[in-house]
């Protein structure tokens, strides 16, 4: 599966199939959330949250790819990510793009 953030695939002719998307809501456990709260007092990267967001992006992307595959797509173009805070310590990641067939 080819994944690109452009609205084309260089050197390829494509046929649009459909919008595809994937999403997930992730949260950290209380212990890691507490330690991250302490880290905000001294500054620096909140590694527990960075890991949470990386995992969420991967899950959402995999869900989008599975939807594209189910439609017979060879690629997803024009991919975009969006995030939002759901509550303290939890975030939603949404990824969407256009499923296409390479001709």
From Swiss-Prot:
Recorded superkingdom: Bacteria
Pfam families: YbjQ_1
Signal peptide: none
SUPFAM superfamilies documented for this protein: YbjQ-like
Family membership noted in the UniProt record: Belongs to the UPF0145 family.
Official protein name in the record: UPF0145 protein NT01CX_0170
């Amino acid at each position: 599966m080819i994944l690109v953030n452009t609205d084309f695939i260089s050197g390829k002719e494509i046929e649009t199939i459909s919008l595809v998307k994937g999403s997930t809501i992730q949260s950290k456990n209380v212990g890691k959330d507490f330690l991250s709260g302490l880290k905000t007092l001294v500054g620096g990267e909140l590694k527990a949250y960075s890991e949470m967001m990386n995992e969420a992006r991967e899950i959402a992307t995999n869900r989008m790819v599975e939807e594209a595959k189910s439609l017979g797509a060879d690629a997803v173009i024009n991919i975009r990510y969006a995030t939002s805070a759901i509550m303290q310590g939890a975030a939603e990641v949404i990824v969407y793009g256009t499923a296409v067939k390479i001709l």
